């Protein structure tokens, strides 16, 4: 590549509008470790912005035109709209305004890349790939959509050749990323406000896979019918498949769970008959998590990692924040915080909870966006079957206006109408505490699900239960 086409070493301060976002902060952190000057603003300070400041960033609380200072370039996410004072000031000055995905793509051009896409499982799979490459001595750079427990951050800058990134399909920008290895975990109808139709989303994933170079690799989960259909349409790129089905190149067999830990073997069918990695363990429950691990195994084998390295790395997997994260245990009741907000994710998490405990499962869900609840209403009414008790909180609007028939009470009524034996509404944290005190017994699990403020409730719950129990 001509050196002139690479990201220059000096750009002036790089200003991020919304630097505290999980997608923006990782890029900012990696840019700083590469020696760039970084500054940015957000509505309020957070653990994420505090970390960036500790690494050398300048942070502005609130968004004002004067925050730009002597910025040389401005980075925005798709959440930043026309009228934002910093965006308008950047345009008034004639500064380059760069979308988040475009800046990520520039960073990726400095490395060989593994990009992880899919409606669900991206963040966990990204973390698993990073974990295995760490163990294999690749020293990867990582930019993720969640905080990796082993790093205490959603990003790290490594000195190695490979970069591992979560590829976000929500606004179509994942097709701008120059992936060398492209992983697709699943494809479900989501983010229709951008794509408009499921066919357009399918085309987006097809483009994501076929954009890889001729020497690249697509790693695809053929347990999912949409991904299997995608594999059938891709005729001129190398593909490795993974899953539980008998045709997968990388296949999980002999799966069982003990105390929330998955034990299984991996048949490397693409390497020939009899190739196995025996005695694999993953310290978290859920068939969906085992499937995600298979994607990481496929990449690790492609890059030449030994079976023992793969086995040891996966056994030590530390997990991702808000992905089946245990936030406490009070009186024998385990409390879990999870980001799941799509019916497919919710059903998978509750199946994992059922595998992890002998007692009952109590699900607490805060729906995220009226539009999602409205579009997928029937799926929401049937995705809580593995929960003995379901409590539904008020919809987290995320800036949307209410939609008739898509409220908290509508969902509770829908759950009951579809046969759930114990569904109810809750209004506040006090209601959640009362529900747990009334329903939970030793050996039970409370699973708080959602992409909004439900995480705060989950993290506060252990102290509330202990404080008032004393």
Swiss-Prot record:
SUPFAM superfamilies: MurCD N-terminal domain (SSF51984), MurD-like peptide ligases, catalytic domain (SSF53623), MurD-like peptide ligases, peptide-binding domain (SSF53244). This is UDP-N-acetylmuramate--L-alanine ligase. It comes from Cereibacter sphaeroides (strain ATCC 17025 / ATH 2.4.3). ATP binds at residues 118-124. Pfam families: Mur_ligase, Mur_ligase_C, Mur_ligase_M. It is found in: Cytoplasm. InterPro entries: Mur-like_cat_sf, Mur_ligase_C, Mur_ligase_C_dom_sf, Mur_ligase_cen, Mur_ligase_N, MurCDEF_pg_biosynth, UDP-N-AcMur_Ala_ligase_MurC. It is an enzyme of class 6 (ligase). It catalyses: UDP-N-acetyl-alpha-D-muramate + L-alanine + ATP = UDP-N-acetyl-alpha-D-muramoyl-L-alanine + ADP + phosphate + H(+). GO terms for cellular component: cytoplasm. The keyword RNA-binding does not apply. Pathway: Cell wall biogenesis; peptidoglycan biosynthesis. Its EC number is 6.3.2.8. The lineage of its organism: Bacteria, Pseudomonadati, Pseudomonadota, Alphaproteobacteria, Rhodobacterales. Keywords: ATP-binding, Cell cycle, Cell division, Cell shape, Cell wall biogenesis/degradation, Cytoplasm, Ligase, Nucleotide-binding, Peptidoglycan synthesis. One of its GO terms (molecular function) is ATP binding. GO terms for biological process: cell division; cell wall organization; peptidoglycan biosynthetic process; regulation of cell shape. PANTHER family: UDP-N-ACETYLMURAMATE--L-ALANINE LIGASE, UDP-N-ACETYLMURAMATE--L-ALANINE LIGASE-RELATED. Belongs to the MurCDEF family. Gene3D superfamilies: Mur ligase, C-terminal domain, Mur-like, catalytic domain, NAD(P)-binding Rossmann-like Domain. Coiled coil: none annotated.
């Amino acid at each position: 590549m001509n050196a002139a086409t690479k990201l220059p070493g000096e750009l002036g301060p790089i200003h991020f509008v919304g630097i505290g976002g999980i997608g923006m902060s990782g890029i900012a952190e990696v840019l700083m470790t590469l020696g760039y000057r970084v500054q940015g603003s957000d509505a309020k300070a957070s653990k994420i912005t505090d970390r960036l400041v500790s690494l050398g960033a300048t942070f502005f609380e609130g968004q004002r035109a004067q925050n730009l200072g002597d910025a040389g370039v401005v980075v925005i996410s798709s959440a930043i709209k026309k009228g934002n004072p910093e965006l308008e000031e950047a345009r008034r000055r004639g500064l380059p305004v760069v979308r988040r995905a475009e800046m990520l793509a520039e960073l990726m051009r400095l490395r060989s890349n593994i990009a992880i896409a899919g409606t669900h499982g991206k963040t966990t799979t990204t973390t698993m790939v990073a974990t295995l490459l760490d163990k294999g001595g690749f020293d990867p750079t990582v930019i993720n959509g969640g905080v990796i427990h082993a790093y205490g951050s959603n990003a790290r800058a490594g000195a190695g050749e490979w970069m591992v990134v979560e590829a976000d399909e929500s606004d179509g920008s994942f097709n701008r990323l120059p992936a060398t290895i492209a992983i697709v975990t699943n494809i479900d109808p989501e983010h229709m406000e951008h794509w408009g139709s499921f066919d357009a989303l399918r085309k987006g994933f097809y483009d994501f896979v076929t954009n890889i170079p001729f020497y690249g690799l697509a790693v695809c989960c053929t347990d999912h019918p949409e991904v299997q259909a995608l594999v059938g349409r891709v005729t001129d790129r190398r593909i490795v498949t993974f899953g539980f089905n008998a045709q997968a190149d990388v296949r999980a067999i002999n799966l069982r769970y003990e105390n929330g830990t998955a034990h299984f073997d991996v048949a490397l069918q693409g390497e020939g008959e009899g190739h196995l990695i025996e005695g694999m363990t993953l310290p978290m429950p859920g068939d969906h998590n085992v499937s995600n691990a298979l994607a990481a195994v496929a990449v690790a084998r492609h890059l030449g990692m030994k079976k023992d390295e793969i086995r040891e790395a996966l056994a030590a997997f530390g997990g991702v924040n808000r992905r089946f994260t245990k936030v406490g245990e009070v009186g024998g009741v385990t409390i879990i915080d999870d980001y799941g907000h799509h019916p497919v994710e919710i059903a998978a998490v509750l199946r994992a909870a059922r595998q992890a405990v002998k007692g009952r499962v109590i699900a607490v869900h805060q729906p995220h966006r009226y539009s999602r609840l409205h579009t997928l209403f029937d799926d929401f009414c049937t995705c809580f079957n593995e929960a003995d008790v379901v409590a539904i909180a008020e919809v987290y609007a995320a800036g949307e206006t209410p939609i008739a028939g898509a409220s908290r009470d509508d969902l509770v009524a829908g759950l009951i109408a579809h046969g759930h034996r114990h569904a109810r509404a809750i209004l506040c944290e006090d209601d959640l505490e009362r529900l747990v005190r009334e329903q939970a017994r030793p050996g039970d699990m409370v699973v708080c699900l959602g992409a909004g403020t439900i995480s705060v409730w989950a993290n506060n719950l252990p102290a509330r239960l202990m404080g008032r129990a004393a």
